[in-house]
Amino acid sequence: MIASALLALGLAACGGGGGDTPASGTTPPVSTTPTPTPTTPTPTDPTPTDPPTVAGTCDLPNFKQDLLTRINALRAAGASCGSSGTFPAVPAVGWNDKLTTAADGHALDMANKNYFSHDSQDGRSFSTRITNAGYSWSAAGENIAAGQPTVQAVMDAWRNSPGHCANLMSANFVDVGVSCRPAASSSNTYSKYWVMDLAKPR
């Protein structure tokens, strides 16, 4: 199941963000006692560990890069989007962490509460979620999907749906953020919940 929404030139509150650069100014203590040489050799290669799980990726490998590659290949080629029309090639979009935050919040909410809609159950629209994530937009759109197991499967579904395809091909959008969340329970309607937010800054 897939759904799309598009909103352009709406009003949105300006959100900002900043970062702190940590500073360190400690001086190591001076030792006058010699340190004994260890008798057990230290391995030069650390013990391999499993890669950390990254939230919002459904544990799919190369999630961000795979999505950007597929989205931008479609945009570079141009596309016929059925009843939404034919779109010429358009510039690539870039990954945006604020849009990803907005997308992830909604994907997680749908996965936890077992629903599928552009509107959150508390009434927030995708444009409100994007604004609340700190992205000041002049154009915004959203694609959602549920049940697709892979990046390729969800991109194929969006590509083959006129409204979703039109969002993917819109020259109005320059940034994208995507999230996938697994169902919170085996009783959920779908196994995975996908959200793609696209936008252009103000």
Segment roles from a protein language model:
Residues 15-19:
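Bacterial signal peptide processing site
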Residues 96-149, 168:
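Short, surface-exposed glycine/acidic/tryptophan-bearing loops
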Residues 1-3:
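Bacterial N-terminal signal peptides that target proteins for export
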Residues 10-13:
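C-terminal motif of bacterial Sec signal peptides marking the signal peptidase cleavage site
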Residues 51-112:
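A short alpha-helix/helix-coil micro-patch that ends at or immediately precedes a cysteine
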Residues 22-25, 137, 141-202:
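Disulfide-stabilized extracellular recognition modules
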